[in-house]
A protein has these predicted regions:
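Bacterial N-terminal signal peptides that target proteins for export
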Residues: 1-10
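Active-site- and interface-proximal helix/loop "cap" or "latch" segments in soluble metabolic
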Residues: 28-127
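Bacterial N-terminal signal peptides
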Residues: 9-17
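Short acidic/polar alpha-helix capping motifs at helix-coil junctions
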Residues: 16-21, 63-66
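Boundary at the C-terminal end of the N-terminal hydrophobic targeting segment
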Residues: 22-26
Length: 127
């Protein structure tokens, strides 16, 4: 009788543990909706801007493209360098943890990028 009671207790405990684990994994909906999002980030006094396009999957940046819009040659050069460098830094990271500082010699363009990412977070947020 003792072994039978022990087996029932063990089986019940295992069943409850598995059920609790499954519930914990499915109870929390994703914070951001998967999809492709685009936003234009502003920065500087002129103002300057860049367009940022991201593919979001499970809250993680799967792809990032930055389109420069500067017309002053030096500014365009900095925006292009930033656009080439930023995917290597942010792809694979959670969107809610992405914030870029000076990168590829540019200190202004990251502000525009961060502004665009903020807008994209708002677009993708599940309400």
């Amino acid at each position: 009788m003792h072994n039978q009671a022990w087996n029932i207790l063990l089986t019940t405990s295992l069943t409850l543990t598995l059920a609790a684990t499954a519930e914990a994994q499915t109870a929390r909906p994703a914070r951001y909706a998967d999809g492709v999002y685009t936003a234009t980030g502003e920065y500087g006094g002129q103002p300057s801007h860049i367009t940022v396009r991201v593919t979001l999957k499970d809250g993680i940046l799967a792809a990032v493209t930055v389109t420069p819009h500067a017309y002053v040659p030096r500014s365009l050069e900095l925006q292009r360098a930033f656009a080439a460098a930023v995917p290597k830094v942010v792809v694979g990271k959670r969107i809610d943890q992405v914030r870029v500082g000076k990168l590829a010699g540019s200190s202004g363009t990251p502000r525009g990028f961060n502004d665009a990412i903020r807008q994209i977070r708002e677009q993708a947020a599940r309400r």
